[in-house]
Amino acid sequence: MSRYRGPSLKKIRRLGALPGLTNKRSKAENDFIKKLRSDKKSQYRIRLEEKQKLRFNYGLRERQLRKYFSIAIKTRGSTGKVLMQLLEMRLDNIIFRLGMASTIPAARQLVNHRHVLVNGRIVDIPSYRCKSRDIIMARDEQQSNTFINNCINYSTHNRMEAPNHLTLLHPFKGLVNQIIDSKWVGFKINELLVVEYYFRKT
């Protein structure tokens, strides 16, 4: 399944806020309509939609998300928490959470166009897994700084503060303090439902 490139509002109306996909917000539904919709959902659909939240928020293909789940199963610890750590420590997401890009797709574009350095070296792989003490910064070129500055200006009013595991040293440079704790994930998700979804598919 390919990466989603359709209307973002269509997805957030169905799944709720997806800050990695877009900083737009859908119009709030009244409580009665929300309850009516939730009452009609099967358990399978509830698990599916929670899985889709992950896919669309982080901009992943189904095959990519399934691969992360396979890694999480084989890793010591809670499968759901490990899965969230793997997704949150992707380079494109770190750039987004630092506020150097307005969305994860915008962050991915920065990486693909070789505007980003990790520990002084160009990294052009959005899925690169960041580690504790990694330093993320723009290349020392006017084009890179301008590109990131435009992203920062665009997202200033919607940008959240950097979570505890990250420090924005200045607009073009950030530090990974540590591996993320699950309580610092940037949007509402029940990762246990995602784990249940994949376990039931196997």
UniProtKB/Swiss-Prot annotation:
Q: Where is the signal peptide?
A: none
Q: Which GO terms describe its biological process?
A: ribosomal small subunit biogenesis; translation
Task: For this UniProt record, give its keywords in alphabetical order, as a comma-separated list.
Answer: Plastid, Ribonucleoprotein, Ribosomal protein, RNA-binding, rRNA-binding
Instruction: Give the coiled coil ranges.
Output: none
What are the recorded GO MF terms, alphabetically? rRNA binding; structural constituent of ribosome
What InterPro entries has UniProt attached to this entry? Ribosomal_uS4 (IPR022801), Ribosomal_uS4_bac-type (IPR005709), Ribosomal_uS4_CS (IPR018079), Ribosomal_uS4_N (IPR001912), S4_RNA-bd (IPR002942), S4_RNA-bd_sf (IPR036986)
- Coarse class of the primary localization is plastid
The subcellular location is:
Plastid
- What Gene Ontology cellular-component terms does the record carry? plastid; small ribosomal subunit
Entry similarity comment: Belongs to the universal ribosomal protein uS4 family.
Q: So what does this one do?
A: One of the primary rRNA binding proteins, it binds directly to 16S rRNA where it nucleates assembly of the body of the 30S subunit. With S5 and S12 plays an important role in translational accuracy.
Mind telling me what this protein is named?
Small ribosomal subunit protein uS4c
Gene of origin? rps4
